[in-house]
Amino acid sequence: MMMADIATAFPAIKILRDEPLAHYTHTKTGGPADYLAFPTNVQETKSLLAYANQISLPVTVVGNASNLIVRDGGIRGLVMILTQMAAITTAGNTVTAEAGAALITTTQVAQAHALSGLEFAAGIPGSVGGAIFMNAGAYGGEISTVAVAAEVLTPEGEIRTLNQAELDFGYRHSSIQDYHDIVLTATFALTPGDGAAIQAQMDDLNARRAAKQPLELPSCGSVFKRPVGHYTGQLIQEAGLQGLKWGGAQVSTKHAGFIVNIDHATATDYLELIHHIQAVILEKDGVTLETEVRIIGEEPTTQK
């Protein structure tokens, strides 16, 4: 029996065909997804994955698309954006958030319950699932210090709960990247604190972020991982690359570790600029800059 296409098979779920991912990424770049689905709960996510597996449709999962570059050729198969799964609950000293919940909102819920430990994440624009996926961090804090469990959907469709050890956190890394699990929820173990003091620390970090980072322009956040013994922004600055324009993309004049979209940039502009920076820094300083930003999708069939 011939299977219906996935959009037809799930009329109750919002599924768009040939949808430009530039509408969703924080860089405002990226080609189309063959199918873009917005599941609202675990069962819908599980059903979409099972159906896609049945018809051999590749599956890609995206959270808030903040630290992400989608190539201009887009993504074949099914892309699921989990931002409709955003419930956050508290119990005692723990906060449990669905994968699509904004990390910023999660920190605000923790503060409202006078729970300390997530202050460092107050300005990180990603989702909870994305934060687990890459062990997000800022200002000396990392998700690995507070995330004690994550409920995941395996590529085979099994729901499992991973403990902190099984999440195998490292610098901008977790086991989710190795096994291609889909994060469904994450649980954070926090410490009782003073709500006003927690808010004051969050306000301070947000002010520091606003002063140093180009928040007013589209970007993918930190482009590169910090190389041992160096500061990425400083290396780029000293190489004379700050302010360099490449198509519609530019090395931020506010913080050289960021690439901003100043004039209808394409993902290709971003990626070519990234490769240029890597080549210059390798030749000048002998330092290999690894990308922190997640890069997915296919090259365009015709280059500009």
Curated annotation (Swiss-Prot):
Entry GO MF terms: FAD binding; UDP-N-acetylmuramate dehydrogenase activity
Active-site residues per Swiss-Prot or TrEMBL entry: 172, 222, 292
Any one GO BP annotation for this protein: peptidoglycan biosynthetic process
EC number: 1.3.1.98
Keyword Flavoprotein: yes
Cellular localisation: Cytoplasm
Annotated keywords: Cell cycle, Cell division, Cell shape, Cell wall biogenesis/degradation, Cytoplasm, FAD, Flavoprotein, NADP, Oxidoreductase, Peptidoglycan synthesis
GO cellular component terms given for this protein: cytosol
Major localisation: cytoplasm
Protein name, UniProt field: UDP-N-acetylenolpyruvoylglucosamine reductase
Organism, as annotated: Levilactobacillus brevis (strain ATCC 367 / BCRC 12310 / CIP 105137 / JCM 1170 / LMG 11437 / NCIMB 947 / NCTC 947)
